[in-house]
């Protein structure tokens, strides 16, 4: 916990990080990705799903695979897959109070779009707490965990890696941040699979089941 005393920039992934995975928002995105690929490539649903997961594994995002393998332009894909129902989310006053209490500035770093991040943050009642969003468009469609975009994220936010913490639900997105000197936090409920695959503990400074649990611990440490 001691490293958090020097943090003045708090960087959060979005989906399944700022809200629990049980809300199944990303399940909606997942289904729409399959439907988009099925239509765009004229393949069966089963083949579309296989390609979707293969590209996620091999390229970091399904979109990156479609762009590299099929020369697909990103806008139609992004608009389609993020056209989801976020009404299942509701304002989270406890989360808001915790994020607001963190000393310094707060940011969102997502492989989704800025519009999607803003919609989700507004539903949670926390959108006004964030100073900036680094999305897939900001990254020129290069996704986490590609190491080249992490310095770009730091530069856009105007923050120092050694004074920044990064909260993420996919372990494979943490090593590039840790290599730059960011304090890394992996958020995952026990017995929940990490679809990005495991990474060594040397890349993860802290583990927690969810964002509110770790923020409570951080604020207790800072207040002590």
PLM features per residue range, with description:
Residues 91, 109, 142:
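Residue-level marker of regulatory loop/turn positions in helix-turn-helix DNA-binding domains and
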Residues 1-7, 100, 113-114, 118-224:
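Asp-based, Mg2+/Mn2+-dependent phosphohydrolase catalytic module
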Residues 71, 102-106, 180-182:
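Short glycine/proline-enriched coil/turn segments at helix->beta-strand junctions
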């Amino acid at each position: 916990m001691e490293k958090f005393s020097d943090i003045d920039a708090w960087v959060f992934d979005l989906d399944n990080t700022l809200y629990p995975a049980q809300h199944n928002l990303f399940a909606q995105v997942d289904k729409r990705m399959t439907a988009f690929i099925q239509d765009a490539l004229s393949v069966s649903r089963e083949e579309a799903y296989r390609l979707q997961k293969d590209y996620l594994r091999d390229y970091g995002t399904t979109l990156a695979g479609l762009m590299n393998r099929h020369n697909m332009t990103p806008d139609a894909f992004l608009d389609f897959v993020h056209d989801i129902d976020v009404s299942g989310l509701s304002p989270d006053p406890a989360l808001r109070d915790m994020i607001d209490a963190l000393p310094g500035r707060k940011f969102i770093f997502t492989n989704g779009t800025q519009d999607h991040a803003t919609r989700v943050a507004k539903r949670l009642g926390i959108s006004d707490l964030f100073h900036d969003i680094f999305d897939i468009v900001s990254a020129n469609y290069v996704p986490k965990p590609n190491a080249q975009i992490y310095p770009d994220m730091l530069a856009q936010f105007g923050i120092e890696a050694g004074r920044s913490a990064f909260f993420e639900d996919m372990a494979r997105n943490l090593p590039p941040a840790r290599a730059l000197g960011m304090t890394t936090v992996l958020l995952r409920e026990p017995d929940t699979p990490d679809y990005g695959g495991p990474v060594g503990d040397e890349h993860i400074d802290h583990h927690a089941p969810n964002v509110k649990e770790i923020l409570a611990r951080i604020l207790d440490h800072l207040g002590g």
